[in-house]
């Protein structure tokens, strides 16, 4: 057992060590006045004036229009798959509702998949549509965070920078170099990178077996660096071609956490308040460790119903013990629990086990992290979501002591709190609203593999995953229906843009305000006390908002499991 905790500690130490240089590089990308030659070529090709400055309205409009154009392009490619080359299996085009769902999924950095990649998409579609939108979605989140940080850093300013400059820089300086290096490591470890759609092998019994291949390593690298999560294969990171060795599993985990953790350091560096960045990092780390401990202990404890049936769930020299249903033996409980906590903390959605097979308490962890949506979070957007809670914390503290709240030298007034609450409320309204609609929709029961509280959890998980732009699933739900493709697609769009746009408006409002020096009545935010308050507000606000739905799903399922009740 102690080896497991040493492994967890080592991973977290590596993440912390990598966050510093990565954060410094991100801050340099966001603040540098120099443009590389390839960036200047990109500006000329796009017709962009890099010296132009954009207010929050134009910054947000550029974000929306670029994402909208890429969504339409992705949709067109998915609908035209039958005419594209490199389609050795002759895969047909996706249906209109599935193509909408897939395009919305990947452009919003969600990567929800209502299809199985290796049997539904051609290699051309995987490269030109899917991998392209993986880059687009990840870069958009980081760029939005850059604009938001500038809003806090600037005083009496009218702009948040230039969206196109930020986009091009993040592409050429961050995403492409990192993805290229990681892809080479994956190829070295045995991840395929080929244009052949299939090879045939002869098994030990003499039978002929078809093995599907493709450009897996290039997709796999941006999948985790960009907190995307969509798999080339339906089994995702549980497939040996996506995750063949312990080293690739560790790189997957560190890749998911790299940019989200580094964004807190970049935030502190750009504001010249590095202690503030470490406080935000510490808040994320505290929540992450708590959720990791919960999912590990829940899964290692096993299922009492199986124990009553005579199954041996104890750790021994020949088995890892615990609840091994839906898990890879090569990963066991420890690496599976770490992956579960990481993929939903960083809103990646990649999986190396079936979340639907977790114990009720273990399954509550990914649900809760997606509902909170700021335990490190996705590339860029995780920091934005955390900062909205930080501003809310300052506001609540200011109200308790009877002073106008301030955050980083900016007064937080009625307009700012209204914008924060718009962003905060958009998330639960989407999750709970669509879940309620699905609960009364006549065809929902036909899509459920389970009845009772777990069936409800499958639906709740789908909309929490879509709205949080996570993409993982309780796979007992058949989501490839017109109803689920449409509503989950809308949930992904709502979760992305109905939170980003109010926060960009907030950044514009704060940028226009002068920065005032801290006074004797200013509530300090770069302290362990504020970190504790921030964690408290995140957990309480998230808990109170979603507690009734969690009580109907995993909580009651856990109680029934402990009492020996099962559903047919």
Swiss-Prot record:
Its main location: membrane. GO terms for cellular component: plasma membrane. The chain crosses the membrane at residues 1-21, 60-80, 129-149, 174-194, 251-271, 278-298, 381-401, 420-440, 488-508, 528-548. It comes from the Bacteria. It is a multi-pass membrane protein. Keywords: Cell inner membrane, Cell membrane, Ion transport, Membrane, Potassium, Potassium transport, Transmembrane, Transmembrane helix, Transport. One of its GO terms (molecular function) is potassium ion binding. It is found in: Cell inner membrane. PANTHER family: POTASSIUM-TRANSPORTING ATPASE A CHAIN (PTHR30607), POTASSIUM-TRANSPORTING ATPASE POTASSIUM-BINDING SUBUNIT (PTHR30607:SF2). Part of the high-affinity ATP-driven potassium transport (or Kdp) system, which catalyzes the hydrolysis of ATP coupled with the electrogenic transport of potassium into the cytoplasm. This subunit binds the periplasmic potassium ions and delivers the ions to the membrane domain of KdpB through an intramembrane tunnel. Belongs to the KdpA family. The system is composed of three essential subunits: KdpA, KdpB and KdpC. This is Potassium-transporting ATPase potassium-binding subunit. It comes from Delftia acidovorans (strain DSM 14801 / SPH-1). The gene is kdpA.
């Amino acid at each position: 057992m102690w080896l497991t905790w040493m492994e967890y500690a080592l991973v977290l130490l590596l993440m912390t060590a990598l966050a510093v240089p990565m954060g410094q590089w991100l801050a340099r990308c966001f603040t540098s006045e120099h443009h590389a030659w390839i960036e200047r070529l990109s500006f000329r090709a796009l017709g962009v004036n890099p010296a132009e400055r954009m207010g929050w309205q134009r910054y947000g409009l550029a974000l929306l229009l670029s994402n909208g154009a890429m969504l339409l392009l992705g949709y067109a490619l998915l609908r035209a798959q039958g005419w594209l080359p490199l389609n050795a299996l002759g895969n047909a085009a996706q249906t209109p509702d599935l193509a909408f769902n897939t395009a919305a999924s990947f452009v919003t950095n969600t990567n929800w998949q209502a299809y199985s990649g290796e049997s539904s998409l051609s290699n051309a579609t995987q490269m030109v549509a899917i991998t392209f939108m993986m880059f687009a979605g990840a870069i958009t989140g980081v760029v939005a965070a850059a604009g938001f940080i500038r809003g806090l850093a600037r005083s009496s300013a009218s702009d948040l920078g230039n969206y196109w400059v930020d986009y091009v820089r993040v592409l050429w300086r961050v995403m492409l170099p990192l993805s290229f290096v990681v892809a080479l490591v994956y190829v070295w470890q045995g991840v395929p990178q080929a244009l052949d759609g299939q090879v045939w092998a002869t098994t030990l019994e003499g039978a002929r077996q078809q093995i599907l291949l493709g450009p897996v390593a290039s997709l796999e690298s941006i999948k985790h660096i960009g907190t995307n999560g969509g798999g080339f294969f339906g089994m995702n990171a549980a497939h040996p071609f996506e995750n063949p060795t312990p080293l690739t599993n560790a790189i997957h985990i560190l890749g998911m956490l790299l940019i989200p953790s580094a964004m807190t350091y970049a935030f502190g560096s750009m504001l010249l308040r590095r202690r503030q960045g470490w406080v935000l990092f510490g808040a994320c780390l505290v929540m992450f460790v708590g959720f990791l401990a919960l999912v590990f202990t829940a899964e290692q404890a096993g299922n009492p119903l199986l124990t009553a049936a005579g199954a041996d769930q104890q750790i021994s020299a020949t088995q890892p013990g615990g609840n091994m249903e839906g898990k890879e033996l090569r990963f066991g409980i420890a690496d599976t629990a770490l992956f579960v906590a990481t993929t939903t903390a960083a809103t990646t959605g990649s999986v190396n086990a079936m979340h639907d097979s977790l114990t009720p308490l273990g399954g509550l962890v990914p649900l809760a992290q997606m509902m909170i949506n700021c335990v490190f979070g996705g590339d860029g957007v995780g920091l934005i979501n955390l900062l909205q809670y930080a501003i809310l914390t300052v506001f609540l503290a200011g109200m308790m002591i009877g002073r106008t709240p301030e955050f980083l030298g900016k007064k937080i007034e009625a307009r700012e709190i209204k914008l924060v609450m718009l962003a905060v409320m958009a998330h639960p309204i989407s999750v709970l609203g669509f879940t309620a609609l699905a609960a009364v929709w006549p065809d929902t029961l036909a899509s459920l593999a389970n009845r009772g509280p777990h069936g409800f959890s499958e639906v709740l998980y789908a909309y929490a995953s879509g709205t949080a732009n996570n993409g993982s699933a309780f796979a007992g739900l058949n989501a490839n229906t017109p109803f689920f493709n449409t509503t989950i697609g809308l949930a992904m769009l709502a979760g992305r843009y109905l939170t980003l746009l109010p926060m960009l408006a907030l950044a514009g409002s704060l940028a226009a305000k002068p920065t005032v020096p801290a006074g004797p009545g200013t509530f300090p935010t770069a302290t362990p006390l504020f970190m504790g308050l921030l964690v408290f507000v995140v957990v309480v606000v998230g808990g109170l908002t979603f507690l009734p739905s969690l009580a109907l799903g995993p909580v009651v399922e856990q109680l029934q499991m402990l009492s020996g009740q099962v559903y047919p």
